[in-house]
Amino acid sequence: MNQPIMNRKIKLLAICLFITTTFMHAQTFLSSNHAMKRVKTADKYILLPVEEEEGYAHIRVIKDNQVVKEFNCKLAINKTDYNVPLDVSEYGGEVLLDIQFSGDKRSIGLINNFVCWKDIKATNVFDSKNREKFRSIYHHTPVYGWMNDPNGMFYKDGVWHLYYQYNPYGSQWENMTWAHSTSTDLIHWKNHGEVIQPDALGTIFSGSSVVDKENTAGFGKDAVVAFYTSAGAAQTQSIAYSTDNGETFKKYVNNPILTSDVPDFRDPNVFWNEEVKQWNLILAAGQQMNIYSSKNLKDWKYESSFGEGYGNHGGVWECPDLLKMGDKWVLICNINPGGPFGGSATQYFVGSFDGHKFTCESKPEVTKWMDYGKDHYATVSFSNAPDGRIVVLPWMSNWQYANQVPTQQFRSANGLPRDLGLYSYNGEDYVSVKPSPEVFAAFEKKPSGRLQSAAYIEVTNIKSNASIVLSNDKGERVTMVFDIIFKFLVCVVLLF
């Protein structure tokens, strides 16, 4: 054997050895629906193959005989629709995956033939480049995975913070976690990933955040304090706090802070009530809203309930908000189902609030809807918004079909931000809703410049009508308009 050939073989052997030590995995089949898979890898992520038509597999991530994470994922059995990343970088290069498939899988073939075993891979980079035709441009969407209710929104130091209900292990509802995005203009959003993850108390359901300017909770001046529902065997309320402007959170050691025997007991919304110098909390409790008060954000006193006999009760009440508008108060109540055109929707009540009790000014049978479209739900406001504004953001979907919309890389979007106001008509007070000024500013940005000679412009990926205007110092103008529906160009010439 000559030397060059030998060198090539040694290099090839070295490459093979490197691959083997970088990602080694072997599975042990324990029954028709139970397996364990030991994974050794120096990479950051394990890619889990997902098949959306299958049932959920319960996965426990075990390190040094301790469960460090558990979640549900529709692992691929017949085919892989897409992959989701499991970050294992903090576990020292080796974990044991304990996988329990739902149901008895003997009817669809032997467990060792499931495609997930060959499609599980390791990588240092998860490709999140958009692959979806129907991803919105002006509406916030998750990079990948499932999203529903907006949560914990606040404004601080020129930045809008949006948290949201998130499933990092599939594009359908499951594994509720808080993920985080930020924006300086309410239109262009930067994704920051997961910030509050499930724990022994349960998954992380909806809630709110406040900026504790006076350090009433003792977590630090200007700490961001998040309130959320721990959805375990029972629904209880918990706290997490941040001292780095909402980038990371630490959970309060004495969670939960509120408990109840009501099954649907969730979605705490907290605000500072300047009129009575106290914190108030409103949350959904069955078919009503409970109101609490506190001086320190930790210890809460029950004050009253609202809802019995008022408005629409065609579904579960959830995701409340209580807002001061002028000399009135508005209580927002999201309901599912029961919307005017089916499914989920947002109703509201106008009245007075003294820090202890909300009193509706309308007759009990009156129902006021914030929006009559089907894709408007879980509407809540940004805390600490500037200039006294009330800025809200809805979830742009409906529980009738949210899990089945025609995307897979991600599912769901938020509606455009909107500012709320109050007006009167025929003796009744109503909430006015209009797109936030930031929305109009985004559409008003039109590139322009002076042409020195001829120019060639190539426009690609057009998703709406577009126009180009050419003009000169004489006031002559040529307007070219592309019609996205009929796919043709119209040219209008104005000469003097």
Residues covered by each model-derived region:
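Bacterial Sec-dependent N-terminal signal peptides
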Residues: M1-S31
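Beta-rich accessory regions
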Residues: T28-N65, V88-E90, V95-R106, F126, ...
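Surface loop/turn signatures of beta-propeller and other carbohydrate-active proteins
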Residues: F29-N33, V67-L86, I108-N151, G170-W173, ...
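Hydrophobic core segments of beta-strands in well-ordered, beta-rich domains
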Residues: L48, L97-I99, D149-Y169, N191-V195, ...
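Beta-propeller domains
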Residues: Y56-H58, I62-N65, F134, Y138-P142, ...
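Repetitive beta-architecture junctions, highlighting loop-to-beta-strand starts
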Residues: A57, M176-W178, Q235-Q237, Q287-M289, ...
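Conserved Ser/Thr-centered positions that define the repeating blades of beta-propeller domains
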Residues: I62, S183, S242-T243, I291-L297, ...
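Acidic, glycine-rich loop-and-beta core segments that form the ion-binding/anion-interacting portion
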Residues: M325-G326, P337, F341-G355
